[in-house]
């Protein structure tokens, strides 16, 4: 059988179309994966630059200014430098625990981004147990730090890992009780439902005004969970060299560096979602596209504005932990544990009882 030239061309074009369809299918599968990763990376770089600029202003010195415009690429330059440094392993340590520890710390924090809503329809996983899943996932990170400290075969590293575990346990309970109070107020543990419950009453419906005591306890507990000054005892330079990070170098040291800022960003995002109304601004911006007769863009416009509002609230709140790091002295270990067990735990329990009583009386 003889096949004409046009038929051969049609067959070739059809095969090329099938190949292109497969390529586009793979690309569209990868887009939802790489988009959050890119967003998180840019967010961390912005936090590092913001902290360096604020700390420079507090200390009356010049911040980074050579790597990129206004020094915004300095963190990227530091990360690139760490990539090319030698990865050292302790000769007498447990190399498996030493290598796995940083990965556990980073992955447990990255998983928390699954339940953070940037809009009513823009959340990777809207679960009924969203906020408690975050607490459960964040409890895994200290295990990685303890593994790193033990696997290093270094007394300073091991002591830093023990401090990280003790600090996490002490402040995880008040944090959980504050989240439980928010869940009772909103009648849901879903992060999307919590934001929508606040948006019903506008600006004065934010949980910041309905739960001021819980907000303060949550703020202090989240700072302790992030190991930020004045709660950075697991890596206190004057006492433990660098804590559980002492024996690390290269990319593994960089993972701890990234995990610290990832945790700070997650905590700030959850403060925005739980207490500051999330993507809600109490201004009817959704009617702007209708005013300009571009109704088809209304949903896209609303989603874009929601992302912008959430990030704006988050980065404005970041001024608090950044400022406290460069203005407050470090606590002693006994002071840190006393604050968690003797003050924050009873206060958070009392706040939970008040919230429960008010909810029962309102039935």
UniProtKB/Swiss-Prot annotation:
PROSITE patterns in the record: COMPLEX1_ND1_1, COMPLEX1_ND1_2
Keywords: Chloroplast, Membrane, NAD, NADP, Plastid, Plastoquinone, Quinone, Thylakoid, Translocase, Transmembrane, Transmembrane helix
Intrachain S-S bonds: none
Top-level class of the enzyme under EC nomenclature: translocase
Gene Ontology MF terms: oxidoreductase activity, acting on NAD(P)H, quinone or similar compound as acceptor; quinone binding
Any Pfam family: NADHdh
Function text: NDH shuttles electrons from NAD(P)H:plastoquinone, via FMN and iron-sulfur (Fe-S) centers, to quinones in the photosynthetic chain and possibly in a chloroplast respiratory chain. The immediate electron acceptor for the enzyme in this species is believed to be plastoquinone. Couples the redox reaction to proton translocation, and thus conserves the redox energy in a proton gradient.
PANTHER family per record: NADH DEHYDROGENASE SUBUNIT 1, NADH-UBIQUINONE OXIDOREDUCTASE CHAIN 1
Stated name of the protein: NAD(P)H-quinone oxidoreductase subunit 1, chloroplastic
Taxon lineage: Eukaryota, Viridiplantae, Streptophyta, Embryophyta, Tracheophyta
